[in-house]
């Protein structure tokens, strides 16, 4: 009965005419930030922008040079029914010029490079999340005993998941499949693919609605890559295809097209540095360990879930690749910018993809992987940042934001190392620390 009432509440929401408008953007971490203005200022927000102080936004300017302007993108307007306000994404400017560290602007610039080649990227994400009962401590309370695709033992979680899906269309998302994931209290709601910029917006919107609905029910939802040691981590597999003149250019006859293979080649070539964007937290590397279906070996294959890149289909409009290492702590604008930049680089340079595998990579011994030329992803955020420093192409994707990003993330890594040292915890620990929970639980 409670479940039915919850669903009815979501369906019957009456959305009054919004009197306030949320101007929303992300910081360098991908966390949602914003300010509200009266709806009467909407046109001003589009035409002239609204100024704000960026000095306290993670990854933005210091206090000595922090005057920024938000300009609304009216194509992103939506209404948030549980708050009764409007919401719009946009771009950040510094004076009359696009601000170098604006994540959405970074992706836009990479997409303009694709467009010069006549290409558009379609991307479908699969973000996973956990739902925990609030109890005021870091002793995370698991509210259900379900497993993969289970239909029993879900109690409140099932109601929350359905209510999330019912709210999603208000924000422009089209839910496709809802199901329980492998971990207890772990869930996934897949939504329809879209062009790259809209997909990045949708990921931000999805995380917003998931957290908000869980909160309405007295629960926490977290997209933290590995909230509990020994439990499956939260991934965000990305299904990617490129289109030209309305045709999917990944389609081949007996396999993927050369364009698709070179795109894969570019990703594999830069995968180590790319990890700094697709897996940008200390906690990300607690997920990327063997045994949990999270890829650690740089390889690719057809329908092979142990590979870093899987090819689910190569015929028809559904021809695509699946990049399996990203997690939902990534800033989606930066992650997609990096992936598309290195993929385009692979196409231009005709990079052939090595490390093709048909069998389970995890079951190979070191000698077999070495024979096949299979390398590994970085084992920590620190290693990923060192790879990023050496990779010109991934740095180029970030553009002027590279310094902001590397400085911010190096401080993050240093703080973690200091925490471990102060408690005599080994630097290579795979246990989830309280430092990580405090820093990443709300990503």
Swiss-Prot record:
Protein's recorded name: Glutamine synthetase
Cofactor binding mode and count: Binds 2 Mg(2+) or Mn(2+) ions per subunit.
A cellular component term, taken from the record's GO annotations: cytoplasm
Record carries keyword Protein transport: no
Residues reported to bind L-glutamate: 233, 287, 293, 305, 324
Binding site for Mg(2+) 2: 128, 181, 188
Sites where the protein binds Mg(2+) 1: 126, 237, 322
């Amino acid at each position: 009965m409670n479940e039915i009432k919850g669903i009815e509440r979501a369906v019957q929401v009456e959305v009054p005419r919004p009197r306030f408008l949320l101007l929303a953007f992300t910081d360098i971490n991908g966390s949602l930030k914003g300010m509200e203005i009266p709806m009467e200022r909407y046109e001003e927000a589009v035409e002239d922008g609204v100024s704000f102080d960026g000095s306290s936004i993670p990854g933005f300017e210091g206090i000595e040079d922090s005057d920024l302007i938000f300009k609304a993108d009216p194509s992103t307007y939506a209404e948030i029914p549980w708050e009764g306000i409007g919401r719009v994404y946009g771009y950040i400017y510094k004076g009359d010029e696009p601000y170098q560290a604006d994540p959405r602007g970074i992706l836009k610039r990479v997409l303009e490079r694709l467009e010069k080649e006549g290409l558009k990227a379609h991307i479908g994400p699969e973000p996973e999340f956990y739902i925990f009962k609030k109890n005021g401590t870091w002793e995370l309370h698991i509210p259900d005993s379900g497993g993969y695709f289970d239909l029993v033992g879900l109690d409140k979680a099932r109601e929350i998941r359905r209510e999330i899906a019912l709210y999603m269309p208000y924000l422009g998302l089209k839910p496709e499949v809802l199901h329980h994931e492998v971990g207890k209290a772990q869930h996934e709601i897949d939504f329809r693919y879209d062009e790259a910029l809209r997909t990045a917006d949708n990921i931000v919107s999805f995380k917003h609605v998931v957290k908000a609905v869980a909160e309405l029910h007295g629960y926490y939802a977290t997209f933290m890559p590995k909230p509990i040691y020994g439990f499956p981590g939260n991934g965000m597999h990305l299904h990617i295809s490129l289109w030209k003149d309305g045709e999917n250019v990944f389609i081949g006859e007996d396999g993927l097209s050369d364009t698709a293979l070179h795109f894969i080649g570019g990703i594999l070539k830069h995968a180590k540095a790319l990890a700094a964007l697709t897996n940008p937290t200390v906690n990300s590397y607690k997920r990327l360990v063997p045994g949990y279906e999270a890829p650690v070996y740089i390889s690719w294959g057809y329908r092979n879930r142990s590979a870093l890149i899987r090819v689910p289909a190569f015929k028809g409009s559904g021809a695509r690749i699946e990049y399996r290492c990203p997690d939902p702590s990534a800033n989606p604008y930066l992650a997609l910018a990096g992936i598309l930049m290195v993929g385009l680089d692979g196409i231009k340079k005709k990079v052939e993809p090595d490390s093709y595998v048909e069998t389970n990579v995890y079951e190979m011994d070191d000698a077999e992987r070495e024979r096949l030329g299979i390398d590994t992803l970085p084992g920590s955020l620190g290693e990923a940042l060192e790879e990023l420093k050496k990779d010109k192409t991934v740095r180029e994707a970030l553009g002027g934001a590279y310094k902001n990003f590397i400085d911010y993330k190096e401080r993050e890594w240093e703080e973690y190392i200091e925490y471990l040292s102060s408690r005599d915890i080994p630097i290579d620990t795979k246990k989830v620390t309280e430092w990580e929970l405090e820093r990443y639980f709300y990503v």
